Amino acid sequence: MKPDGAAPRRVLVVDDEGDFLATYERLLRRHGFLVIVATTRADGVAAVVRERPDLVISDLRLPDGSGLDVVRAARSMPEPPSVIVVTGYPSAETRQAALAAGATIFLAKPFAAAGLLAAVRSSLRDGDSTETAT
């Protein structure tokens, strides 16, 4: 959320599943965030550079490659945004790979709206905390 008078926080969501995108957009906009959407790895990486979001939420499995490329692109920025990785295929290996690439929070799909909001707020507040949630 934004302090009074401040510009809305910018959240880039990278996911190819329409239902999840609609949920992210509705929830985040309702809570005052400006939402930017990408549906492929390539578009996600380009949006990280072009839009300079405050937060990136990226699925791991994208139609043209790994969401880890989006994570790496985000974390390589001069002022890197926090990154939440989401996946419908959670495992110890995927969690470790996401955190090693620079994700700050790892969420397993499906998750409750309250869990996503808590992760978003934590990421924007703490920046570099590393957490796992389900």
List the predicted regions and their residue ranges.
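Active-site residues of response regulator receiver
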Residues: 15, 59, 87
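Two-component/phosphorelay signaling modules centered on CheY-like receiver
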Residues: 18-36
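The feature encodes the CheY-like receiver
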Residues: 21, 63, 91
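Acidic catalytic/metal-coordinating carboxylates
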Residues: 40-43, 66-69
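Active-site beta3 strand of CheY-like receiver
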Residues: 51-57, 62
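Alpha4 helix (beta4-alpha4-beta5 surface) of REC/receiver domains from two-component response regulators
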Residues: 69, 90-107
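A short, hydrophobic beta-strand element within the central beta-sheet of small alpha/beta folds
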Residues: 80-90
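C-terminal output helix
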Residues: 93, 111-121
